[in-house]
């Protein structure tokens, strides 16, 4: 019975991988908005109805496919963090790497973190379980942070280091967290809608500047 269930799980993950990779190809070769059930099923080599055996709807499939970009981010993050001299540099380097990746793909990241995905809860964790063979060892150490689907929780977890080191008062933590997310979300939204004419480097630099000012305003 256990063997049968394992085989079913392996088969399920294999099929999901076919559809996820097909969706990723469409996003990269065409665009985010070009993804349709028909295109994905044709590219994967199955009929359209098969998709619904593994995904609730097209939105869930697209969400899974967007998570690939977090994998790329996690690999670069290891490099960005290695020269951090203190917790402040460590925190700012997390944001620097995150901004660089998300501002290159604003629609992907906005979809991942600022769109209502109630039905997709747990998708990030399931994605990394499906593609566990593709994750290198250094990236595995960052999985607890990466697996959090709520960007407020992700950032709050990182900010707690400032409280533990008596840099920020505990009572101000939630306000600071909210302020930083608003800064990032605003820049991401403006880039997504072509409301600003910033290069990725300039947008990242401005975001880091505002985050730094926010932290200093709450510093003990």
Regions found by a protein language model. Give the residues of each.
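Basic, helix-initiating cap at the start of DNA-binding domains
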Residues: 1-43
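C-terminal peripheral helix-coil segments that are non-catalytic and often amphipathic
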Residues: 2, 149-165, 169, 173-220
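An amphipathic alpha-helix adjacent to DNA-recognition modules
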Residues: 13-24, 33, 54-82, 92
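Short, hydrophobic secondary-structure boundary micro-motifs
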Residues: 36, 110-113, 121, 171, ...
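Short hydrophobic/aromatic patch on the recognition helix
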Residues: 44-55
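Hydrophobic alpha-helical connector segments
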Residues: 79-111
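Amphipathic alpha-helical packing segments from all-alpha helical-bundle domains
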Residues: 93, 118-165
């Amino acid at each position: 019975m256990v063997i049968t269930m394992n085989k079913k799980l392996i088969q399920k993950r294999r099929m999901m991988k076919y559809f996820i990779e097909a969706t990723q190809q469409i996003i990269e070769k065409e665009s985010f908005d070009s993804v349709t059930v028909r295109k994905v099923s044709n590219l994967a080599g199955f009929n359209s109805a098969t998709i619904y055996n593994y995904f609730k709807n097209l939105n869930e499939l697209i969400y899974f496919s967007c998570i690939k970009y977090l994998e790329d981010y996690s690999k670069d993050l290891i490099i960005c963090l290695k020269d951090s001299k203190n917790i402040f540099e460590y925190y700012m380097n997390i944001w620097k790497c995150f901004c660089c990746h998300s501002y290159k793909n604003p629609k992907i990241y906005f979809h991942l973190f600022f769109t209502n995905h109630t039905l997709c809860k747990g998708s990030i964790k399931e994605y990394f379980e499906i593609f566990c063979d593709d994750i290198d060892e250094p990236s595995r150490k960052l999985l607890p942070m990466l697996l959090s689907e709520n960007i407020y929780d992700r950032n709050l977890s990182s900010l707690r280091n400032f409280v533990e080191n008596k840099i920020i008062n505990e009572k101000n933590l939630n306000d600071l967290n909210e302020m930083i997310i608003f800064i990032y979300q605003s820049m991401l939204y403006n880039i997504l809608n072509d409301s600003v004419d910033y290069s990725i480097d300039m947008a990242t630099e401005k975001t880091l500047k505002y985050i730094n000012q926010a932290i200093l305003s709450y510093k003990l």
